Amino acid sequence: MASRDLPHSLNDLAFGWIKHLKEEIIINKNSQQLVDEDFQPDEDVTKETKVKLNNLWPAFASGAGLFADGYVNNSIGIVMACLKILYGDEFTKSNAISNIGSIGFVGTVVGQLSFGYISDRVARKGGMMTANIMLIAFTLLCAVGSWGTTIQGFFACLTVWRFCLGVAIGAEYPTSSVIASEFANQLPAGKRNRYFIWFTGFMIDFGFVVSAFVPFVLLWIFTEKHLRALWRVSIGLGAILPTALFFIRLKMKDSTSFEKLHMKNVRYRDYPWWLIVKFYWFRLTIVSMIWFIYNFSVYSFGTFNAIILGQIIPDAPLWQQWGWSVVFNLFYIPGSFLGAFSADYLGPRLTLAIGVGLQGIIGFIMSACLNGLRKQVAAFTVVFGIFATLGEFGPGGNIGLLASKTSATPIRGQYYGIAAAMGKIGAFVGTWIFPAIQRRYASKTNPDLELQVPFYLSSGLCIFSALLTFFLCPHVGQDAINREDKEFVEYLRKNGFDVSKLGEDSSSVDVDVVKDTDSAEKISETIEVGQKLA
């Protein structure tokens, strides 16, 4: 096994991270220093010094599709609430109530893993466009679909389309996020991380907020007498942004780094599977564990929403419940927005560790003081808001950034897809484990215990995740993608893989040149010259 990421001694484990701080922390560097230190394998490439609109729009167009992940996933909660009111015991006592939620996780994992492979081995842009079409189609089918004339047939129909929609959402992760990271890499050093997070993780959080606000407004329009129309329109509106993005994405091209380094032309039997596993097994394990723990813990953190709502509005009408849902979702926005800046100034590794570590500490305090906080609703709401903000400040935005920048371009889709899938599996496991823990510790003498125990567990996992990130996660500098591509190609070459098989035309494109630029015309001219000489 390759051991480049493994600590080679106890001293290396405890203090090895110190030597990389100067690459991660740039808060004390001016723009000229960042330009000078920015690693570019191709000396002819002009380093960007300003953020230009023509460099921003491909990153936005690719990453913004994740808005649907936040919007549609949160909208399903609204759907479930409406179905409970509309159908009562016929819904709550059927398998549909668990199937609709669980099947979405399964579909998302299938989409993440399958399209991770498609993104690397078949077509990166093609995979993104396919995911886009699926997202539009299955969102609309969830909104309007039915099956026969019976209620159970309708529940079965919704379950099937929810699975398909999950596949489409999962497909967006290893296609659009990966493309966004490669285009964000062509921005000036010192500003790359923030734009990636704003166009990916922030879009998910924005989707959560909009999905809470839309049904709140629709409730004013339709009233509680027309909940069927309300939930269908609410879901259907989720297809608007993907439809707009589809036409924008049509004009996009694959990033230059992917064109130069992809392995689409490598036959399956020649594909260096074992070399890839040896090179990435450890860091992929660490990134996947961090993502798993974060999503696993999020479920128990959400239980405190119910406590606050129960104290503020115990018998409130539906519009008040949904209004407070908007408030809770708004807590995510400042965390994700500020975390994007910190990801540039402190680096994503340190930002994630600080955010999730502080979240764990506050989680312990909230759990220990639960009985007192119940009586101070305003204080409870503020503390919970800070708590939720820290979650998005740290892992919420930065875990995807770490997954995209700790892997090389030829395998980034599969690497990202596996890590993201582990995160969704963590969320799925959490939905089953924490209710079981709550039932186990339910007590009439101490009613707080059933909430404190899972919260203590999740907070402890947050601290563990912070330690994993701090001591074992690879450091990520501004030029991490460029350096990782170069190291990976050199590793393949040294281990006997024919690197001339990489990219579109290895006879004319230097595989060491991995910087994303918009110099497509220069590349085309180089290819033509190479073909004439051949």
Swiss-Prot record:
The chain crosses the membrane at residues 63-83, 96-116, 135-155, 163-183, 202-222, 230-250, 289-309, 322-342, 350-370, 377-397, 417-437, 453-473. Induction: In contrast to the other glycerophosphodiester transporters, expression is largely unresponsive to phosphate levels. This is Glycerophosphodiester transporter GIT2. Belongs to the major facilitator superfamily. Sugar transporter (TC 2.A.1.1) family. Disruption phenotype: Triple deletion of GIT2, GIT3 and GIT4 impairs the uptake of glycerophosphocholine (GroPCho) and reduces virulence in a mouse model of blood stream infection. PROSITE patterns: MFS. Disulfide bonds: none annotated. GO terms for biological process: organic anion transport. InterPro entries: MFS_dom (IPR020846), MFS_sugar_transport-like (IPR005828), MFS_trans_sf (IPR036259). It comes from Candida albicans (strain SC5314 / ATCC MYA-2876) (Yeast). Keywords: Cell membrane, Membrane, Transmembrane, Transmembrane helix, Transport, Virulence.
